[in-house]
């Protein structure tokens, strides 16, 4: 297994987020052409094969890909510069998303894809550990205050990951998912990131939102060939966000504790 260097970026020596946003590699889907090479091309084609499959359960992702709305960040490794690169790209994405007009056709999702050199693991749990390590490192370099109204502890139903002042929902997808195929976007580990508010608009705790969620969860069960995870729920209604970031293969109760800790806690 080539996962990530334990403690490599922990403690002192955190990289600083580039305030100017220079060297950020936020790539628009519409910019991707034949010049995309190597593992970037492999990863993009894997993702395309999923999101053009009519059976893929997330209709919002399929719509975004069909309309070339998806944004990408490709991460080469797990060093300081790689975290800096990802942080700058994520900051640009947050800035792009701040003035969202509420329309589905301007709801740009972000897919962060990691090379096999950054992480190659043997299990879903190991990929999740890497994903949480990345989120912890992003939190460490984020100079923006945590948004008011969002709890700082992931064991609260009112917590979500935040970056550059924006609450986010993050989906960890990995090649180790053999049962939950809807969380497998191909040969590379990926974080699928959206602003938290979009789920409240399209699939929140309203009659129409509950209908959307029910439809998607039915599609998940058919696509995966197994009932959807017990941990799936709506923000602020008792379900824990962090458990939905990384789903386990089995349908079971979970008693594990989120590895994310708020800076200074």
Curated annotation (Swiss-Prot):
An annotated Gene Ontology molecular function: metal ion binding
Keyword check for Cell cycle: no
Highest taxon, organism lineage: Bacteria
Keyword Phosphoprotein assigned: no
Segment forming the signal sequence: none
Classification via InterPro entries: Uncharacterised_YqcI/YcgG (IPR014988)
Keywords (A to Z) from UniProt: Antibiotic biosynthesis, Heme, Iron, Metal-binding
Effect of gene knockout: Cells lacking this gene do not produce cycloserine (DCS).
Alphabetical GO biological process terms: antibiotic biosynthetic process
Coiled-coil annotated residue ranges, if any: none
Cofactor(s) of this protein: heme
Function text: Involved in the biosynthesis of the antibiotic D-cycloserine (DCS), a cyclic structural analog of D-alanine, used as an antitubercular agent. Could catalyze the production of N(omega)-hydroxy-L-arginine (NHA) from L-arginine.
Annotated family: Belongs to the DcsA family.
Name of this protein: Putative N(omega)-hydroxy-L-arginine synthase DcsA
Species the sequence originates in: Streptomyces lavendulae
């Amino acid at each position: 297994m080539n996962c990530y260097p334990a403690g490599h970026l922990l403690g002192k020596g955190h990289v600083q987020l580039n305030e100017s946003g220079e060297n950020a590699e936020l790539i628009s889907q519409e910019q991707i052409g034949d010049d995309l090479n190597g593992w970037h091309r492999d990863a993009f084609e894997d993702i395309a094969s999923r999101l053009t499959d009519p059976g893929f359960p997330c209709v919002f992702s399929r719509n975004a890909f069909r309309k070339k709305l998806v944004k990408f960040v490709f991460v080469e490794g797990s060093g300081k510069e790689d975290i800096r690169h990802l942080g700058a790209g994520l900051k640009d994405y947050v800035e792009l998303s701040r003035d969202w007009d509420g329309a589905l056709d301007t709801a740009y999702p972000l897919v962060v894809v990691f090379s096999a050199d950054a992480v190659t693991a043997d299990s879903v749990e190991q990929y999740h550990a890497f994903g949480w390590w990345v989120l912890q490192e992003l939190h460490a370099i984020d100079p923006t205050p945590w948004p008011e109204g969002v709890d700082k502890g992931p064991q609260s139903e009112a917590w979500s990951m935040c970056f550059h002042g924006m609450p986010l929902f993050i989906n960890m997808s990995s090649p180790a998912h053999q049962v939950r195929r809807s969380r497998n976007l191909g040969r590379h580990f990926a974080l699928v990131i959206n602003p938290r508010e979009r789920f409240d608009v399209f699939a929140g705790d309203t009659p129409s939102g509950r209908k959307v969620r029910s439809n998607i969860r039915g599609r998940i069960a058919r696509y995966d060939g197994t009932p959807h995870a017990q941990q799936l729920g709506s923000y602020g209604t008792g379900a824990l966000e962090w458990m939905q970031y990384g789903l386990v293969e089995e349908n079971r109760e979970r008693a594990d504790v989120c590895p994310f800790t708020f800076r200074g806690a």
